[in-house]
């Protein structure tokens, strides 16, 4: 007879190993598992470990040709989720051998590739990953990182200011370039292509790049400050994307942009390598993230997508605004903001961080706060995000009643006032409105902005809770 017993397997015999001591080289994952009724949590956790590593649904004779113990994923711990009836956190350890070096694509294909459609589970969410230094070291990471970016821009001791050019679709290249110039001239550091501005019939990419470069150089000459515009290089093919990045380099501009989730991790990593080799900064937009991360019970939490981006490479990434939202969300957001910027992040479940993560000096990424923010938010943003961040006011600049340059002036004055107040030891959380009011006495542009946006709020209950 053959040396194995055919039939459908009980996963937990092989893949649930509560005594396992995790190794420093393992990739560790925390999954939020919602089993189907009647499926015990150990079996569900083991099934996740199996299906995302070596397992298949039945015994196969080729199993005998490998060392299962060396290659299998292991569910090594399960804990119930407080306040949920039938939900568990399953911790899975994957041996490093299972992953291709320097490939975020392969890491995700392995860990989340197949298992999310698994019938024994009602829902599954990847909450966090621990990437071991041995794997991190196979990635280049961000093209430049926070310190190099500050040195390139010669801007220190404050957050950077940006603005997304609106209306996002329909402007001609010349009018688009004019809006870029006006915002930069007024005092912003950066302007931004919207994520869906690629190369459409009303504005082809090459024309846009040219007029934006002209706007940058004119604003630089007049202000004596270094300026940038995130030229979106996202395209339908990797070749076309690199072609756009090459043209940006030829124009001598400082920064390009990519939509890393719609563009894909393979394209993103290629672009990040090009950017480091050619001295371009890389701004990353997270279009499509909410499709993946918004459901509490199913999908992938954004902190995992943020870690993946730091491996794949990007110098800025959009990461929520916190402002006007609830407390719990603030802690969770700051959790992954720290993951992006710091060298080491300690395990802290109150902030949604399941594992201590060391980045072994991989450069950090600047978090970008963007979407529905205006001058009244400036004290809170300065306090929450600190100096190492990019604050982006699209409508909050272009919506100014006197036009774009005064809109930019208002934001810059508000920021400088908040930074100065903080440096003088004032409490931004408590005195924020007062600080903005005082500054607006000296700046009619800011006073007008304060008047327009005094009633605007975007308050809804938090989605992202522990």
UniProtKB/Swiss-Prot annotation:
Keywords: Calvin cycle, Carbon dioxide fixation, Chloroplast, Disulfide bond, Lyase, Magnesium, Metal-binding, Methylation, Monooxygenase, Oxidoreductase, Photorespiration, Photosynthesis, Plastid
The keyword Ribonucleoprotein belongs to this UniProt entry's keyword annotation: no
Catalyzed reactions: 2 (2R)-3-phosphoglycerate + 2 H(+) = D-ribulose 1,5-bisphosphate + CO2 + H2O; D-ribulose 1,5-bisphosphate + O2 = 2-phosphoglycolate + (2R)-3-phosphoglycerate + 2 H(+)
Localization annotation: Plastid, Chloroplast
BP term (GO), one: reductive pentose-phosphate cycle
Residues with site note (Transition state stabilizer): 325
KW tRNA processing (keyword) present: no
Residues given in the record as substrate binding sites: 114, 164, 168, 286, 318, 370
Annotated EC: 4.1.1.39
Cofactor binding: number and manner: Binds 1 Mg(2+) ion per subunit.
Entry binding sites for Mg(2+): 192, 194-195
Post-translational modification: The disulfide bond which can form in the large chain dimeric partners within the hexadecamer appears to be associated with oxidative stress and protein turnover.
Cofactor(s) in the UniProt record: Mg(2+)
N6-carboxylysine modifications at: 192
This protein's GO CC annotations: chloroplast
Active site, renumbered: 166, 285
Modification type N6,N6,N6-trimethyllysine: residues: 5
Any one GO MF annotation of this record: magnesium ion binding
SUBUNIT field: Heterohexadecamer of 8 large chains and 8 small chains; disulfide-linked. The disulfide link is formed within the large subunit homodimers.
Family: Belongs to the RuBisCO large chain family. Type I subfamily.
UniProt-recorded name of the protein: Ribulose bisphosphate carboxylase large chain
Organism encoding this protein: Drosophyllum lusitanicum
Organism phylogeny: Eukaryota, Viridiplantae, Streptophyta, Embryophyta, Tracheophyta
